[in-house]
Amino acid sequence: GKVNYETYSYFKSLFFSTLYAEEFKYKVIGKLKTDNVIDFPEGGKFVSFHHEGGFETDIGKYGEYQCRGSILYDKNEKLVNMFFACENFDQNGQKFINMGKRFKGSDIDRAVGNMSIIEGEGFWKDYIGYRCTYAVEYVNKVIFAPAQCKNSF
Protein backbone atom coordinates (compact mmCIF):
# COMPACT_ATOMS: atom_id res chain seq x y z
CA GLY A 1 0.00 0.00 0.00
CA LYS A 2 0.81 3.68 0.33
CA VAL A 3 2.84 3.41 3.53
CA ASN A 4 5.19 0.83 2.05
CA TYR A 5 5.82 2.98 -0.99
CA GLU A 6 6.53 6.07 1.16
CA THR A 7 8.85 4.07 3.38
CA TYR A 8 10.56 2.67 0.29
CA SER A 9 10.97 6.17 -1.24
CA TYR A 10 12.35 7.49 2.02
CA PHE A 11 14.94 4.72 2.29
CA LYS A 12 15.71 4.93 -1.41
CA SER A 13 16.45 8.67 -1.12
CA LEU A 14 18.48 8.05 2.04
CA PHE A 15 20.43 5.29 0.31
CA PHE A 16 21.13 7.31 -2.82
CA SER A 17 22.09 10.45 -0.92
CA THR A 18 24.88 8.48 0.77
CA LEU A 19 26.08 7.18 -2.61
CA TYR A 20 26.37 10.53 -4.31
CA ALA A 21 25.66 14.15 -3.46
CA GLU A 22 23.06 16.21 -5.33
CA GLU A 23 25.58 19.03 -5.23
CA PHE A 24 29.17 19.47 -4.17
CA LYS A 25 31.90 22.09 -4.01
CA TYR A 26 34.96 21.73 -6.21
CA LYS A 27 37.95 24.05 -5.98
CA VAL A 28 41.15 24.21 -7.98
CA ILE A 29 44.39 25.99 -7.21
CA GLY A 30 46.69 25.88 -10.17
CA LYS A 31 49.46 27.58 -12.04
CA LEU A 32 49.52 28.88 -15.59
CA LYS A 33 52.07 26.76 -17.50
CA THR A 34 51.78 28.19 -21.00
CA ASP A 35 49.91 31.07 -22.49
CA ASN A 36 50.43 31.29 -26.26
CA VAL A 37 49.07 34.44 -27.87
CA ILE A 38 48.34 35.48 -31.45
CA ASP A 39 47.89 39.26 -31.59
CA PHE A 40 45.62 40.58 -34.33
CA PRO A 41 46.61 43.80 -36.15
CA GLU A 42 43.42 45.59 -35.05
CA GLY A 43 43.86 44.73 -31.37
CA GLY A 44 42.04 41.44 -30.84
CA LYS A 45 43.88 38.32 -29.71
CA PHE A 46 43.63 34.55 -29.58
CA VAL A 47 45.07 32.87 -26.49
CA SER A 48 45.82 29.17 -26.04
CA PHE A 49 46.36 28.27 -22.38
CA HIS A 50 47.44 25.34 -20.23
CA HIS A 51 47.29 25.31 -16.45
CA GLU A 52 47.70 22.57 -13.89
CA GLY A 53 47.55 22.10 -10.15
CA GLY A 54 45.41 20.52 -7.48
CA PHE A 55 41.72 20.23 -6.70
CA GLU A 56 39.68 19.49 -3.61
CA THR A 57 35.99 18.81 -3.02
CA ASP A 58 33.65 18.60 -0.04
CA ILE A 59 32.76 14.98 -0.98
CA GLY A 60 36.06 13.51 0.20
CA LYS A 61 37.90 13.63 -3.13
CA TYR A 62 41.02 15.58 -4.00
CA GLY A 63 43.78 15.26 -6.55
CA GLU A 64 45.53 16.83 -9.51
CA TYR A 65 44.18 18.45 -12.63
CA GLN A 66 45.24 20.06 -15.88
CA CYS A 67 43.19 22.25 -18.23
CA ARG A 68 43.80 23.32 -21.81
CA GLY A 69 41.74 25.75 -23.78
CA SER A 70 41.50 28.82 -25.92
CA ILE A 71 40.08 32.32 -25.59
CA LEU A 72 39.23 34.86 -28.26
CA TYR A 73 39.19 38.56 -27.28
CA ASP A 74 37.97 41.41 -29.45
CA LYS A 75 39.92 44.65 -29.94
CA ASN A 76 38.37 46.13 -26.77
CA GLU A 77 39.68 43.17 -24.73
CA LYS A 78 36.16 41.81 -24.29
CA LEU A 79 35.76 38.05 -24.30
CA VAL A 80 34.20 36.76 -27.52
CA ASN A 81 34.53 33.02 -26.90
CA MET A 82 36.28 30.55 -24.64
CA PHE A 83 36.41 26.75 -24.73
CA PHE A 84 38.35 24.37 -22.49
CA ALA A 85 38.73 20.79 -21.25
CA CYS A 86 40.18 19.62 -17.93
CA GLU A 87 41.52 16.24 -16.88
CA ASN A 88 41.26 15.41 -13.16
CA PHE A 89 42.79 12.46 -11.27
CA ASP A 90 41.60 11.91 -7.69
CA GLN A 91 43.57 10.33 -4.83
CA ASN A 92 42.46 6.85 -5.99
CA GLY A 93 43.70 7.43 -9.54
CA GLN A 94 40.15 7.70 -10.91
CA LYS A 95 39.74 10.21 -13.68
CA PHE A 96 37.00 12.60 -14.73
CA ILE A 97 36.86 15.13 -17.55
CA ASN A 98 35.09 18.46 -17.36
CA MET A 99 34.56 20.84 -20.25
CA GLY A 100 33.34 24.37 -20.33
CA LYS A 101 32.88 27.47 -22.36
CA ARG A 102 32.12 31.11 -21.91
CA PHE A 103 30.59 33.41 -24.44
CA LYS A 104 30.62 37.10 -25.26
CA GLY A 105 30.61 39.35 -22.28
CA SER A 106 32.16 42.23 -20.43
CA ASP A 107 35.50 42.04 -18.62
CA ILE A 108 33.63 41.06 -15.45
CA ASP A 109 31.90 38.10 -17.14
CA ARG A 110 35.31 36.84 -18.02
CA ALA A 111 35.85 35.52 -14.51
CA VAL A 112 32.60 33.52 -14.25
CA GLY A 113 31.58 30.50 -16.30
CA ASN A 114 30.00 27.07 -16.53
CA MET A 115 31.44 23.63 -17.05
CA SER A 116 30.08 20.08 -17.07
CA ILE A 117 31.51 16.74 -16.07
CA ILE A 118 31.27 14.85 -19.37
CA GLU A 119 33.07 11.57 -18.58
CA GLY A 120 34.23 9.77 -15.46
CA GLU A 121 35.61 6.51 -14.11
CA GLY A 122 34.55 4.58 -11.00
CA PHE A 123 33.29 6.98 -8.33
CA TRP A 124 32.91 9.75 -10.93
CA LYS A 125 30.49 7.79 -13.17
CA ASP A 126 27.66 8.98 -10.88
CA TYR A 127 28.66 12.60 -11.48
CA ILE A 128 28.55 12.60 -15.29
CA GLY A 129 26.19 15.37 -16.40
CA TYR A 130 26.74 17.54 -13.32
CA ARG A 131 26.99 21.25 -14.17
CA CYS A 132 29.34 23.54 -12.29
CA THR A 133 29.38 27.31 -11.99
CA TYR A 134 32.84 28.65 -11.28
CA ALA A 135 34.61 31.93 -10.59
CA VAL A 136 38.28 32.54 -11.38
CA GLU A 137 40.75 34.74 -9.51
CA TYR A 138 44.36 35.20 -10.58
CA VAL A 139 47.30 36.21 -8.40
CA ASN A 140 50.13 36.61 -10.89
CA LYS A 141 50.25 33.14 -12.51
CA VAL A 142 48.36 31.32 -9.77
CA ILE A 143 44.71 30.44 -10.43
CA PHE A 144 42.03 30.06 -7.74
CA ALA A 145 38.74 28.70 -9.05
CA PRO A 146 36.01 27.68 -6.61
CA ALA A 147 32.99 25.99 -8.21
CA GLN A 148 29.55 24.80 -7.16
CA CYS A 149 28.41 21.62 -8.96
CA LYS A 150 24.82 20.37 -9.20
CA ASN A 151 23.06 17.36 -10.63
CA SER A 152 21.46 18.64 -13.83
CA PHE A 153 18.95 15.78 -14.16
Where does each model-flagged region fall?
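Beta-strand-enriched cores of mature, soluble protein domains
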Residues: Y20-F153
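Extreme N-termini of proteins with methionine-enriched Sec-type signal peptides or N-terminal signal-anchor
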Residues: N4-Y5
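N-terminal signal peptide c-region/cleavage motif recognized by signal peptidases
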Residues: F16-T18
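Bacterial N-terminal signal peptides
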Residues: S9-L14
